Structure formats: C-alpha cells, structure tokens
A protein has these predicted regions:
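N-terminal leader/linker segments that initiate helical-solenoid repeat arrays
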Residues: 4-60, 64, 73, 80
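Canonical positions in the second alpha-helix
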Residues: 39, 77-78, 111-112, 145-146, ...
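Register position in tetratricopeptide repeats
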Residues: 25, 64, 98-99, 129-133, ...
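Helix-start (N-cap) detector for alpha-helical repeat units in TPR-like alpha-solenoids
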Residues: 13, 47-48, 52-53, 86-87, ...
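Canonical tetratricopeptide repeat
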Residues: 50-53, 57, 91, 125-128, ...
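Structural marker of alpha-solenoid helical repeat scaffolds
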Residues: 42, 46, 81, 115, ...
C-alpha cells in the first residue's frame, strides 16, 4: 500500500486524489477507491502526509461503498506503517465494533488513547461508539479518563463540561461550561443549552441555543433544537424561521428532522398549502416513513 511519492509525480497524485474526492461526493465510491489507488500508485520514495491523507479518504470510500473489510485492511496498513497512529487505531476500532468484533475494538481504542492521550474528541468518540453498542459502562471509563487532561483554556472547559453532561453530572457541567462561555467559547453555549434541555429548563435552553446561533457558528442541529423550543411555546413563525436557517446551511446533517418539523409548524400555523409542498418533498426523500405517508394522505 505504501511506497512514497517523488516530487515529479506529485501533481498526478494530487489530480487522482481530486478525482477520488469528486467521485465520493457524487456517490461513486467504487470509482473513488480506484482513483485513490491510482493516486497511491504514483508514489515512490518517502511517505508524506499526502499519502496518509489519501489512505484516509480511500478507507472512507470503501466503508461508504459497503466494503468494510477493505476499509479495515486500509486502516490496518496505516497501523502497520506507523504503530503509533492513534487515529487509525480509533477508526479501525469503530469498524471492528460494527463487525461485532468487540475484542479487537477494545484493543484498538486502548491503543488510540495511548498514542493520543490529550485528545478530548477521541475519548468522547470512543464513548459514543461503545454506548451505541450497549457498552455504556466501558464507554464511561473513557470519559472519566479524559479528566486526566489538564488545562483551563476555553477549549478544556468546554470539553470537560460536555463530558460531565454525557455522564449526567449536570451541576459540574454547568460550572465548567459557564467558565468556558466567560472565555468566549461559542460551542459552550450549545452544550449549556443541551444541559438545560436535559433538566427540562426550556427558558435557559432557549437562551443558550440563541446565544449559540448569535455567535455565527451554529449548526443545523442547533437550529432544529431552537425551532422545537419555539414550537412548544406556540411560536410557529419563529420556529419556521429557525428551520429555514437550518436548511439553508452548507452542511445539513439532520434534514429529515428539519423537514418533519417544518411540516408540523406549517400545519399549526394554518398554512396547509406550504405544508403540502414540504410533505411532497419529504415523502420523495424518505418514502419509508409511514407517519409521513399518512400525513401525505391527510394533506392531499
């Protein structure tokens, strides 16, 4: 898999890399893998970050195309090349877990934090993967290990606050996150909103969701959460505006939830014509949603 790349062939390598990325974006994962292999075949000599980057893309394309074994092999090749590549261990562990190979996953996760001991995101990612596979206690062990990371920067406080939130220790979460907000962490507003939402304090949840939106860094998930709070209060026009902002974002990760709430908000505001327009779009995108099919029949 690895040999390296000379300067003379770097341009061809980067061209094939670009072709692979474009193929991934269009859903042609087989073509993407072929392009990434062509990029790597240009390599002779010393390995650089470019080759490693291409391998990450290749593994992602293999996974997206349903070739989990191929993706595992690619990550393993990266580990064989650099036995201290914590990120490759983590990703190999995630896929091993999907294959129900929990023993390998646990070893991979242990190596991931061994070589990247100061990466909060890594600990949280491991927790989420383990908890999603009915191993919450094992996941919480990683969350608690993350407290060994020292520091009182805005980033440290934000991550610690989020971890306390995941552990259900809301008082500690608020303390850390309020400290992060004072140090101008926009993300801390989002996590504070989630803490207050978990405590069913909708007033404070709305306050911090709005602060997150006002920071200019909000994502579509935050816009949907803010819309749901507005809907609970009967402010359907405000909810619709939040939903429109969420759908207009560059990276919309929760389109289905946003469209579903948009239909409901239009209905409750009495705008059945707009609700009908959205439900037609929704049913075409998510034909297996039985509730949406019933809504389609109702509005029709």
């Amino acid at each position: 898999l690895f040999t390296g790349c000379t300067n003379e062939r770097l341009e061809d390598e980067l061209d094939f890399r670009k072709i692979g990325i474009n193929s991934m974006q269009s859903g042609d994962y087989e073509g993407a893998v072929a392009a990434f292999n062509s990029a790597l075949s240009q390599c002779v000599g010393k390995i650089t970050d470019t080759e490693l980057d291409i391998c990450y893309y290749k593994a992602a394309a293999q996974y997206a195309g349903g070739d989990i074994e191929g993706a595992l092999a690619t990550y393993q090749a990266m580990i064989d090349y650099d036995e201290e590549n914590g990120n490759a261990y983590y990703l190999h562990g995630c896929l091993s877990l999907k294959q129900q190979d929990t023993d390998t996953a646990k070893k991979d996760f242990a190596n991931a934090v061994k070589y990247n001991p100061d990466d909060y995101e890594l600990y949280v990612g491991i927790y989420e993967n383990l908890a999603g596979n009915n191993m919450t206690e094992e996941g919480e062990e990683y969350l608690n290990k993350a407290f060994d990371i020292k520091g009182n920067s805005a980033e440290n406080l934000t991550w610690r606050g989020r971890i306390y939130y995941l552990l259900g220790q809301y008082d500690n979460a608020v303390k850390e996150l309020e400290g992060a907000v004072k140090k101008d962490s926009a993300k801390a507003n989002l996590y504070l909103a989630q803490v207050y939402e978990a405590e069913e304090d909708s007033a404070n949840a709305e306050k911090y969701y709005q602060a997150y939106v006002d920071s200019g860094t909000a994502d579509s998930v935050a816009m949907n959460a803010l819309a749901e709070i507005q809907m609970e209060k009967g402010n359907y026009e405000a909810a619709l505006e939040d939903i429109r902002q969420g759908l207009a974002m560059d990276n919309v990760t929760n389109q289905q939830e946003l469209l579903s709430n948009q239909i409901i908000a239009y209905e409750y505001s009495g705008d059945f014509s707009s609700a009908w327009d959205v439900v037609q779009q929704y049913v075409s995108l998510y034909p297996d949603d039985e509730a949406a099919q019933r809504e389609y029949i109702f509005l029709k």
